[in-house]
Amino acid sequence: TSPRDKLAARLAASWSRLVCVHGEANAWPRHHPEREEPETVHWVAHRPATAETFEAVMAPRQALAQATPDHVEMSPERLRAGGTVQQWRDAWTGFTRPDDILVMWGAYYRDLAAGDGLPLSVPSINLRDEVSRLLRRRFGTVEASMDSLGAKPTLLALAGRGGRRLSALVGALESLRAPAPPEATTGRAW
């Protein structure tokens, strides 16, 4: 059995528990004189097995970095009108289940959200690490891996870069749930 088939079997066995997550931050350039620590301002999630989707926009708790609206692809007004961190935590607690397994692309936004107090003490899968092992190369973004995986983004009605990135993550996950096509096991290094 190929490594890809083993991953597909693992994902299929846990499919009902998988929740793809992505966050976006209000973050200043590292050496900016007004720099404060990054904070989560957009958190999105999707449960592929049931098509349940979660979205929370949190108002910045500190000064909005000048580049943040363009970076996260949301207007300053939308960001400033976001909810509180407590509202986000409460809504997230209502969305999650005790046996969830979070699926993310890298750990930065998960770690940032945990630092913001989001309860994330559940198992997780870093899909970037899994894809890097399978394809024997490192991908910076989930979008950069799509062609190599033969994946297409799953259309999700979510705003901004967070929505786009989550759509790509869900598409990548769905492509990996299927066993490798025959040509993948005979000619390529999986």
Spans of features found by a protein language model:
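Metal-dependent phosphoesterase core characteristic of DEDDh/y 3'-5' exonuclease domains
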Residues: 11, 16, 33-42, 46-74, ...
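N-terminal accessory regions of nucleic-acid-interacting proteins
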Residues: 1-23, 30, 190
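Metal-dependent phosphoesterase signature
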Residues: 70-91
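Short acidic/glycine-rich beta-turn/loop cap or linker motifs at sensory/regulatory domain boundaries
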Residues: 24-27, 49
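Short, contiguous clusters of charged residues that form electrostatic/catalytic patches at enzyme active sites
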Residues: 2, 86-90, 167, 171
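Short His-Asn-centered micro-motif
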Residues: 21, 82, 104-106
